[in-house]
From Swiss-Prot:
PANTHER family: 40S RIBOSOMAL PROTEIN SA (PTHR11489). Residues 264-310 are annotated as: Disordered. Residues 270-287 have a biased composition (Low complexity). It is found in: Cytoplasm. The keyword Cytoplasm applies. One of its GO terms (biological process) is cytoplasmic translation. Belongs to the universal ribosomal protein uS2 family. This is Small ribosomal subunit protein uS2. Residues 288-298 have a biased composition (Pro residues). Disulfide bonds: none annotated. GO terms for cellular component: cytosolic small ribosomal subunit.
Length: 310
């Protein structure tokens, strides 16, 4: 009887952790915690390094990922699930997760009262809330607790577990770690729904869930932009000879479009003999008579008498 119970509780072989998945989690630093440890996170700690960093047990992380995927699949309408991240490193992963699973994504700052104030236009009553960091997303956690909304969150070693129903122990501060976790969770959800066969590889790369710098994204968009083609497309390409020379028919058809050359201006011969002198009156050495005076008519004003002030 106990054997049958254990077999029923064990996950399917296709969904069990594989070496490639564990290596990917290790490469993304999912197992690295912080130097502080919350008392409710001690059960998920594997050991502590010499520099004080706590190491998270990835076996516990995989079990919690499967539990979270089962809860997500149990909800009939995916739009009743809200995936939210106020941390910049998790915003792209949240959008990609919502794209492939059909959930509703909120990337950025949480508007207070979204889950409690019915007068707001953005008011919603989700059936499940998935968060990236309980410390950064403390406001939606408190509002979800007031509305009896179950909460799933990625919890680091120093994350508070208050009002968190399912805490997935993992590194929630690295951009590669957050993207890897959401990629694994999305793949598990699609496998449990039957969208992806468990034995086959998912064709979506994990790199799509990683955070990208704005400058890097802008540079890639500029490189992928289509270049403008200014080439001539209406010429007769078949008329070009094999040696690359234009035949005479094309020269005749384009003869009207070729502008005529400008006639040359005859040059001046400075060595020619001097011409005949100019006509009379053109000698500059001749004396010029003085100009004639023009008489001024009288104005009719008498001569001003002396005033004695001179």
């Amino acid at each position: 009887m106990a054997t049958a119970t254990n077999a029923a509780a064990a996950p399917p072989r296709q969904l069990s952790q594989k070496e490639a998945d564990i290596q990917m989690m290790l490469a993304a630093d999912v197992h690295l915690g912080t130097k502080n440890c919350d008392f409710q996170m001690e059960r998920y700690i594997f050991k502590r390094r010499n520099d004080g960093i706590y190491i998270i047990n990835l076996g516990k992380t995989w079990e919690k990922l499967q539990l979270a995927a089962r809860v997500i699949v149990a909800i009939e309408n995916p739009q009743d699930i809200i995936v939210q991240s106020a941390r910049p490193y998790g915003q792209r992963a949240v959008l990609k997760f919502a794209q492939y699973t059909g959930a509703h994504a909120i990337a950025g700052r949480h508007t207070p009262g979204t889950f409690t104030n019915q007068l707001q236009t953005s008011f919603s009553e989700p059936r499940l809330l998935i968060l990236t960091d309980p410390r950064t997303d403390h406001q939606p956690i408190k509002e979800a607790a007031l509305g009896n909304i179950p909460t799933i969150a990625f919890c680091d070693t120093d994350s508070p577990m208050r009002y968190v129903d399912i805490g997935i122990p993992a590194n929630n501060k690295g951009k590669h770690s957050i993207g890897c976790l959401f990629w694994l969770l999305a793949r598990m959800v699609l496998q449990m729904r039957g969208t992806i066969r468990p034995g086959l590889k998912w064709d979506v790369m994990v790199d799509l869930f990683f955070y990208r710098e704005p400058e890097e994204a802008k540079q890639q968009e500029e490189e992928e932009a289509p270049a403008v083609d200014y080439a001539i497309t209406d010429f007769n390409a078949g008329a070009i000879a094999a040696d690359g020379q234009w035949p005479g028919t094309i020269d005749q058809s384009w003869s009207d479009a070729v502008p005529q050359p400008i006639p040359a201006v005859p040059g001046v011969n400075w060595g020619a003999p001097a011409e005949a002198p100019a006509a009379a009156g053109g000698d500059w050495g001749e004396a010029v008579p003085p100009p004639q005076q023009i008489p001024v008519p009288p104005s009719g004003i008498d001569t001003v008498q002396p005033s004695g002030w001179d």
